[in-house]
Structure formats: C-alpha cells, structure tokens
Amino acid sequence: MAKMEVKSSLLDNMIGVGDMVLLEPLNEETFIDNLKKRFDHNEIYTYIGSVVISVNPYRSLPIYSPEKVEDYRNRNFYELSPHIFALSDEAYRSLRDQDKDQCILITGESGAGKTEASKLVMSYVAAVCGKGAEVNQVKEQLLQSNPVLEAFGNAKTVRNDNSSRFGKYMDIEFDFKGDPLGGVISNYLLEKSRVVKQPRGERNFHVFYQLLSGASEELLYKLKLERDFSRYNYLSLDSAKVNGVDDAANFRTVRNAMQIVGFLDHEAEAVLEVVAAVLKLGNIEFKPESRVNGLDESKIKDKNELKEICELTSIDQVVLERAFSFRTVEAKQEKVSTTLNVAQAYYARDALAKNLYSRLFSWLVNRINESIKAQTKVRKKVMGVLDIYGFEIFEDNSFEQFIINYCNEKLQQIFIELTLKEEQEEYIREDIEWTHIDYFNNAIICDLIENNTNGILAMLDEECLRPGTVTDETFLEKLNQVCATHQHFESRMSKCSRFLNDTTLPHSCFRIQHYAGKVLYQVEGFVDKNNDLLYRDLSQAMWKAGHSLIKSLFPEGNPAKVNLKRPPTAGSQFKASVATLMRNLQTKNPNYIRCIKPNDKKAAHIFNESLVCHQIRYLGLLENVRVRRAGYAFRQAYEPCLERYKMLCKQTWPHWKGPARSGVEVLFNELEIPVEEHSFGRSKIFIRNPRTLFQLEDLRKQRLEDLATLIQKIYRGWKCRTHFLLMKRSQVVIAAWYRRYAQQKRYQQIKSSALVIQSYIRGWKARKILRELKHQKRCKEAATTIAAYWHGTQARRELKRLKEEARRKHAVAVIWAYWLGLKVRREYRKFFRANAGKKIYEFTLQRIVQKYLLEMKNKMPSLSPIDKNWPSRPYLFLDSTHKELKRIFHLWRCKKYRDQFTDQQKLIYEEKLEASELFKDKKALYPSSVGQPFQGAYLEINKNPKYKKLKDAIEEKIIIAEVVNKINRANGKSTSRIFLLTNNNLLLADQKSGQIKSEVPLVDVTKVSMSSQNDGFFAVHLKEGSEAASKGDFLFSSDHLIEMATKLYRTTLSQTKQKLNIEISDEFLVQFRQDKVCVKFIQGNQKNGSVPTCKRKNNRLLEVAVP
C-alpha cells in the first residue's frame, strides 16, 4: 500500500488564528483576544498575510535553537506555525533564487523588541547561508558588529533596558550563491544629549557603565578613572545597576567583538581614551569671576580634572582652558573674542562632550564599515535590515522625540504605500479583480513636518538662520502663525478655540496628532539642538590634540581650512538622511515585522489590552488585515492546496494525474463551493471568506479521521491474517522438531547402553590380563633380588680384602719415607748455607722489577689513543708483564679520552664508527668522508621563508635536509629534489616551491644499494605492495652519500628495531614500476669530465659511468 505523506501547515494544531486574515469576525476586540490567547501559550508571532506581528515576551523562549533554524529552512511561508524565521527564510530565498533585493522593516514602540528581532534575522541568515573560512569570517564580523554598536548607541530608558538611541540600517551584501560578502551600516541621529543629561530612571550609554565595571585595575589607572559611578556627573545613579545585566561581562564581550570586527589594539585603546575623556569632561566645574570692566567670566574650580583630560588627549592645558573661557567669532576679515560666563562655559563643556561622543560614534560606524564592506567588485545582491527607534511618547518630549516620531511617520507612510502596492500587484499578476478599501494616509502629517516652505523643520531652520535674537519662544510663535489651521497641529495660540482653555496643553508646548496618537512637545531646546553649535575655539583645541583619533574627529578645527559657512542644521541633515533611506527602501522588496509591547512594566506573562489596542490602532494593523481581505482572505498555490485537500474528492485521491489547477477545479466542483466564494488565479487559488477555508479544514479533519479508521481496519485484518499464517507455520515446525527430538533421545539411549556393555567387557578382559602380568613380574623380581643379594655378598668380601692390602702398603711407604728423610738429613747437614742463594735471587728479581716500574713511570707515552709509542722492555722475562701493562694503559687512556666527550660528540663518533663498520674497505668513497663532519641539515629550512610552507607541513624532527639529484626512471636524467629524513618518514620536496612530492614511511624501506666505486649514486628499495612503491624504487645521487646512508641506517634501526640491508655491488636490480632494471656501474671516459653520468640503455639496463 502506498505511503501517504501529509504536509504540515500553520492551520494544524492552531492556537487561536495564526493568520489574522482568517480571523472571523474581524474587529478590534477579536483581534486583541486572538493576540492574547496566542501570547498566553507562548505563541508570540502572528501573521497578517506576509507581515509578522511580534509580541515581546520579556523572557527567553526555546524557539530559536539550531533545530528550529533547520525546521524553517527552505520551507513554505505558511507551512509551519508563524515565526520570524519564516519571514527571514522567505526574504533570503527570494534574494538568492529570484535575484530580488530585500529589505526587512522592523517597527514598533520603544521596548517592543525591535533590536532583538533584527539580531534574530541576522543570526538566521548567517545560519542558513554557505559555509567556508572566508564566509564564516564575514558572518562573524557582521554579527559581532551588533555588540559594539549596542554598547555605544544603546541605553536603558524607562520603557526598555536596551533601547536603541540611534537608527541603524544595515545592507548585507551577498554573492550570486547567496553567501555573504560584507555589509554597510548607516546610522541616523544618535541621541547625543543623553551624554550630558538623562531623565530620571534612565541611564547614559551602556559603554560608560561597562568600562567602569569590566575594565581591569591597570586599564582604569591608565585611563585615570575610578570604578565608583558616583564620581562622575554625567552618570545617573538611580539606575546605575540594571537587574539581569552584567556590565563587566558585557565589556569583555565588546572588547572581543571589536577584535573580531577588525579593530587594532591601539584603535581600541584610543576609543576607550575618548570615552574616558568624555566622562571626565562632566567633572569640570566653573566658578564666576568679575573683571575690571564689569563683565563676568568663568574660571575652572579644580584644574586636576582638566590636567588629566589633557594628559589623556595630549592637548596643551592652556589651550583647552582658554577654549572653555573665551569664544572667538570670525567674520570675513575680523575676529572678536569674548569671555564666557559660567552658564556659557557649562554649555560649551556639554557641547564638547556631546560632539566628541557623537563624532566618535560616527567614526566607529565608519571603521566597522571598512572592516565588513565587500572586498570584491562583482555585482551584489542586498538585504537591508532596518532597526530604528520606535515611536516615543514620554512625559517630556523634546527635539529628539520629534525627530524620532517624524522618522516613524515616514516608515508608516512607506508601509502603507508598499503594502497596498504589493497587494494590488499580486491581484494584477494573478488576473484577479481588485477591490479598493479606505485607509488613513498619514501623508498629511509628514507634509506638516517636512514641507519645504511651511513644514515645522523648514520653519525651525529658518528661525535658526535668521539674524537677531532667536529663542524657542519665537520659534513657537512662528509655528502658531503658520500651522494654526492645520488639523493635526494643536497649540494654546492656535486659532481653534477649544485649545485656548486646554490645561493639558502648556503655553510653551505644541501638540501633533501623529498616526500613533497625540504627542506633546516642549519647545525648550529645539533651537539649540537643531543648531548643534560647537564653539570654534573648542574645535581648534581638539584639532591641536596629539591624540590622532581626536584630531581626526574635528577637521574643521584646522586653521588652514577655515570655513565661515554655517554648517547644516541637525534637522535638515536628518531629513535628508530619511529621504535617502526612503528612496533606498522603495527599490527593494519589503518584508515587515511589526513589534508590539504587551505592557509598560517590562515583565513577562502580562498582557495589557488597552496598551496593545493603542499600538494596533496607530500601526494600522486592522486596516492592513482589511486590505488583505478586501478581495480574498486566503490565497495559496495550486500544488500545496491540492496536496492538502485532495482526500476530499475521489477523483483526486490518492494521486491526481494532471495539472494542479485542474485538480483544484475538480475538487472545488465536487465540494460544491459557491463560485462567488473563490477565484482561480494564474498560479494560486483565492478564497474570499475565511468561513469557506474553515469549512474545508473541518471536511479535511473529518476525512482524515475516516482515512485513519480505514487504515486501522485494513491494518488489523492484515495483522490477524499474518498472525494466523505464522501460527500455522509454527505448528508444522514444532511437530517436526518434536519428532526429531524423540528420535534423537531414543538413539542416545541405545548408544549409551551399548557403550556400558562394551565398557564392562573390556574391563573384565583388562583385569584378567593385568593379574597374569603381575604374577610374571613378581617371579622375575624374586630371581633378581636373590641374585643381587649374592653378588653383594661377594663384592663386600673382595672389598674388605683390598682395603686390608692397601693399609699394609701405605704403612710400608710411610716407614720408608721417614727412613729416607732421616738418611738424607744426616748426609746434607754440612751443606746448610746453600739456602742463602734462593733468597739473594728473589731479592735481585724484586729489585729489577721495582727499577723497571719506576723507569716506566717516567717513560709513559702521551694520553692520545692513537699514539702507538711504548718503551722497550729491559729484560726478556718481563715480556708478558710489559705487554699486559701496555694493554691496561691503553684501555685507561681510552676511557679518559671518552670521558671528556659531550653527548653530542659521542653521537657524532658513534655515527662515524657506524659508517666505518658499514663502508670501510667496501666503498671507495668512504676515506674521503672520514674528515668531513656529518651536518645533517645542509638546508636551513627554518630560516628560509621560501620553505615556510614545507616547514609547517613537517611536524617531526628533521634529521637530514639536503639537495640531491633524483634519477628519472624513464631516461636516466637527474632532477634536483630536497631530500628530508625525519624520525618516521623519508620525504622528497620540490627545490623551488618547497611542495612535498613523495612521502615514504621508514617501515616501507627494505634496502639501500650502491656501488663500490668513488661515486655518490645509491638506490632506496621499497617494500612491494606498499603505497609508496606504486612508482617503484628511488635512485639518487649525492655528494654526502656516506652520511645519508649512515643516518638512514641508524634511524631505521631505531624506529623498526631491524637492521637496514646495505648492499654494495657494482651491479644490482631496482624496481621501476612493473619492470626490474639492472643498474650497472662501468669505468667512464676521462674526456667526459670527473662527474659520473647516467644513461638508460633499454628497458632492463641503466648504466652509470664513473670516471
């Protein structure tokens, strides 16, 4: 039976509704209820068509593992439950397979999880793209750029512990295979005012706290910092520590990330020095001092902080102190210098700190771009990831919130335009009628802000540039004049009477009705922040710094390049950047992730319906669903649709043989689905009402239960039949085995009985024979015993007789001896003095030996073992003693000679001795090698850079490194090769490139052959059948033949414990591939020179002519 494969879908095991397009009925209450139901079951992702809604869970979920990455890899968008990985995979495959540039737009409030979403997108793309050393390096650099940018650009706010205080857009560049080549990062409007002041409950940028918490004591001392946060005025103390955040560990992560991205050590140190200088700038305090002319000026209270800053940045202390006290204004040909009061001095200090940090951040982004940018010039595919600050509504909203919310308005505008455009294009592409739906277009709000003549930004620039007194109040007055009638602008001075008594709208504020809601803006600081003014004196002081990084951050401080033109305002710069970003996004295929914050407490498991409702409204999610459902709520390609519902029709089940569209048409006709409820596109089926889809799902579920019942019935029948047949076969087998067992048992009984009977008979016969043999043995033993006793008696009698006769003879001899002694003593008593001669002889002999030894002491030869001199003996009788003394002295001086050698010298002499035993009187070349030291390493491989690759490839100790001539097996010509001998291998390498050509294990070397003549040719024979012997034996020529053969012999003996066979003959055989070739040495002609020549005569002979 064919196996049925049922593919999964987001419709399977669905909690709530996975795609809001299928929600029925569709209203705000059901929308929020569906999100809450999925949120409570840890389903934080929901679709609106191809748009992903992400609800921040404020905790880690086990849905981002490598296994999950593999689950969503190369899968259909609707095949699995909603996930950010599905959108990432869809965008990546569209880029790789369809050659469409992609952009992923991540929007939402601050704290909704946009930064984490962007990191998840990048990590997924990095996981699914290609592998390889270069590709992995690019992926690692792209991923590690995030920790660096987060440390310098993110901070804790009241709504988010890791809030992005800058906008980031990264273009990731891919090659035609989909492998990453590099990337380019663009940053937008760093909130640099945070450097000098933070709202209550918020922190400065992460890097300040990470540096003080994670830097070593040595580094802090070098940067002139202390670990105590309270020492620095620029750091807020009420939120210095964040629960669950380890600043020290994060600092180590940032340092490691900077190293991976490509920052050099001195660059990282320079960055930290600038950060330390910014921190210490906040500790500079001023005091007022009156001058003679009545003007107030400021003086620095404690110059110690100023001194340390100047030491860090290598700035002249006098120059920096003057820059804090005076301001120089330059006209065309005129300079005016004025003193700064205390308030102006503090303004100058804070402006310097903000500009220094802001420019450092821009330098960091450019430095990262240099490292991660694509190195090739080929055409690239691009995937853009936009992680930009979310819509912000605080108690006090200033210029930064105004700019941030303007950017979000533009993103909402492009979302509306591209969503409608994509929907309309799909209907046109599929030839489906398009039904228009009304929606709120926020273009009117964008125009209120960015209009070149009457826009708020244009009027702010105009106010900043006009002469005269310019304040935030004059700017507000101008807004009231121009924008008073605008329906989305509110102010106490506007012409609408209902705002005149609105106590929620202060006189110094204005309110804009954004797409996300109304936001009240304090005009205080708008003009200053837009001007972004830094006194020229401070710029010039920074340019004079000996610190190369700080000097590069202030090019306008160069006196040789004075530019009197006013720099562009912050608002105009940001407006131009946003316009460029919008144009960039419109050229790419958009993918949307809409992030939603479930509560303001940053806590898990809390779902604030009113807060979520507000976000749903201003994000326009309901309108997005209605746009998707304006024509048809559900659409699917024909193939997966037929695959999913084919069991509902007999004609399409189990296999449809024909086009998928025809199968779907047959299926829908069979199910009698009304024509007005569906339409057939070119490649997709479109279903108008979600109820129709759910009816299909119910029918499919019921049909699957019926199929399951059918499969169970067939399976149970098959199982019973199989069991019956098995029992039947088992009965036959059991009966056969039982009969066999019974016959075997009966045979064993008969056999056992026969053996018992046989054993009893054999035993009876054996016992009978044994009794007869024992009787015969006893008779023989009795006769032997009687004879023995008789012979013994006779022997004892004879022995007694012989002993008595011997005693008598001995007594006679003793008596005779005594008698002779007495007789002799009586006869020679008169000659007693004759004994003195013996004594004189012995004395004389002793004196001669003594004199001999004393003379030998003074005549001893030198201690050289090769000195053959030895004094002559004076007397013949001392000959043996003389030779023995010579032998003993020679052994003694040899021992003394050996004792003075080092281990290295002993090894050299052992090798020389080995060479002598192997080649003396056998090889004519040997005598010339005696005086030559064995060097081994004739090539300095370790020192020669040309052989670095060869050196890295050899991990063992090199015993011989020499250039030899390898004889070509085919024609006898020679080729230079590097001959290398290690502890375990013999290697041949190319002399020019150092590439290893051959590697032979010493265990495969069986013999070395050479001639007896004065030449350097030798053959290395290899074990037959070994891998190294595939081309045959080697034939070499070398000027150091004796040394190479000796070391090869000793090394082989040390490693294999077997002596290497050394054959010395003027004719020997070698194996060249499949042929055995005779190498014959002949006497050469002197006319051909003194160098031996080699020539291949035929397939069986190779001649070597030795002159």
From Swiss-Prot:
In-chain residues carrying the UniProt-annotated modification Phosphoserine: 60
PROSITE patterns tied to this protein: IQ, MYOSIN_MOTOR, TH1
Tissue distribution of the protein: Prominent expression is seen in the brain, lung and liver. It is also expressed in the heart and testis. A high level expression is seen in virtually all neurons (but not glia) in the postnatal and adult mouse brain and in neuroblasts of the cerebellar external granular layer.
Superkingdom, natural source: Eukaryota
Keywords: Actin-binding, ATP-binding, Calmodulin-binding, Isopeptide bond, Motor protein, Myosin, Nucleotide-binding, Phosphoprotein, Repeat, Ubl conjugation
Domain Myosin motor: 15-701
Molecular function terms, GO-annotated: actin binding; ATP binding; calmodulin binding; microfilament motor activity; phosphatidylinositol-3,4,5-trisphosphate binding; phosphatidylinositol-4,5-bisphosphate binding
InterPro entries xrefs: IQ_motif_EF-hand-BS, Kinesin_motor_dom_sf, Myosin_head_motor_dom-like, Myosin_TH1, MYSc_Myo1, P-loop_NTPase
GO biological process, one term: actin filament-based movement
Function summary: Motor protein that may participate in process critical to neuronal development and function such as cell migration, neurite outgrowth and vesicular transport.
UniProt name for this protein: Unconventional myosin-Ib
Organism, as annotated: Mus musculus
Lineage: Eukaryota, Metazoa, Chordata, Craniata, Vertebrata
Gene name of the encoded protein: Myo1b
